[in-house]
A protein has these predicted regions:
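N-terminal "domain-start" segment that seeds a small globular fold
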Residues: 30-73
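Short active-site neighborhood of thiol/selenol oxidoreductases, capturing the structured segment around
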Residues: 71-102
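Thiol-/selenol-based redox modules, centered on thioredoxin-like
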Residues: 164-211
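Positively charged n-region of N-terminal signal peptides that target proteins for export
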Residues: 1-4
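Structural microenvironment flanking redox-active thiols in thiol-disulfide oxidoreductases
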Residues: 96-148
């Protein structure tokens, strides 16, 4: 092997090794760049999937900590619940950033008596990888065969069974009062945009009559 080729070969190996060793920091750096400017202050479009306002929240068909979950009662706060429908905590950078931001502001929701529960289509093993990495204490449940998202009327129908992304929802938030009544929703047509955590809390408090 010629000296130049040896040098190129060694540099390539070192680059690959560095990429492997620092793959998670690199991934997070890329995700940070991708998600810059994703948060907005309000629901600024007319995209409005999901259960009707003033209807009864229909429940879930999901798993949480190895058991079946159909009700959101165990996740609710004294004044209500925000159900966060998210695409994936395994591959969707916007979803990951949103949940990290919600976690950063969880104390504010707790102080307002508003519980949060997140639901994605991910396998629980993939969810826990994210939860453990970022110290997420917000409950995260796993939809079963897209049944929750179908029932809620938020399943993204651009994908078909067998496709990688089949089962993802239109991402958004549903505000439910202590009696199980839907009192507010935040859905944006662009999956790359989300209402920020503080703005979502302000919206939820108003919808629940807490202001």
């Amino acid at each position: 092997m010629k000296p130049l080729f040896k040098i190129v070969f060694v540099v390539l190996l070192l680059t690959l090794a560095a990429g492997y060793l620092y793959r998670e920091p690199l991934k997070q750096m890329i995700f940070t760049q991708i998600t810059e400017g994703m948060f907005v202050a309000e629901d600024n479009d007319d995209f409005d999937p999901g259960p009707a306002i003033n209807s009864h929240f229909p429940g879930l068909q999901a798993t949480y900590q190895g058991r079946s979950v159909t009700l959101i009662d165990e996740f609710k706060g004294a004044n209500g619940t925000i159900v966060v429908a998210s695409r994936s905590l395994d591959w969707c950078p916007y979803c990951m950033r949103q949940i990290i931001q919600l976690q950063e502001n969880k104390a504010r929701f707790d102080a307002a008596g508003i519980g949060i529960v997140v639901i994605t289509y991910d396998d629980p093993i993939l969810q826990h990888a994210f939860i453990d990495t970022f110290g997420i204490t917000i409950p995260v449940v796993s939809d079963i065969n897209a049944l929750s998202f179908k029932t809620l009327g938020i399943l993204n129908e651009d994908y078909r069974p067998g496709e990688f992304q089949y089962g993802i929802p239109h991402p958004g938030m549903i505000v439910v009062d202590p009696q199980g009544r839907v009192v507010g929703k935040l859905f944006l047509e662009a999956y790359s945009s989300r209402v920020g955590a503080v703005a979502a809390l302000t919206f939820a408090k108003a919808a629940l009559g807490l202001n």
